[in-house]
Regions:
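Short, flexible catalytic-loop segment of classical short-chain dehydrogenase/reductase
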Residues: 43-54
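Rossmann-like NAD(H)/NADP(H) cofactor-binding core
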Residues: 35, 40, 98
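Active-site helix of classical SDR
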Residues: 17, 25
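Catalytic Tyr-x(3-8)-Lys segment
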Residues: 58-78
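Active-site loop immediately N-terminal to the catalytic Tyr-X3-Lys motif
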Residues: 4-12, 71
């Protein structure tokens, strides 16, 4: 089991929602590919948002930042390029059923 697949106390609903996105992304491929519809998703790591401002302590965010190989938390802007890439028929027309992780290497080790 990979570290990203393990839950943590107090995050069961959040973890379930991420698992849902992953599962439905892969399931819809079988249903929609015959209609030439591609299904992909972005799986962000720790992204600085109001969610983390409200539910994470500065100490926890700093500890997370130090564990990320790139030594920084992600931003919403970090997700823009991957979203454009996966949305483009020209750039990713033969890519479907993929979950693209945008996390600065957060779950490598």
């Amino acid at each position: 089991m990979c570290i990203r697949d393990r839950g943590s106390a107090g995050s069961s609903v959040y973890a379930a929602s991420k698992a849902f996105v992953s599962g439905i992304t892969r399931s819809l491929v079988s249903e929609l590919s015959p209609y030439n519809i591609r299904i992909n998703a972005i799986s962000p790591g720790t992204i600085t948002t109001k969610f983390h401002e409200q539910y994470s302590s500065p100490e926890k965010l700093e500890a997370t930042r130090l564990k990320i190989p790139m030594k920084r938390l992600g931003s919403a802007e970090d997700c823009v390029g991957p979203i454009i890439f996966l949305s483009s028929q020209t750039m990713s027309g033969y890519i479907t059923g993929q979950i693209l992780e945008v996390n600065g290497g957060q779950f490598i080790s």
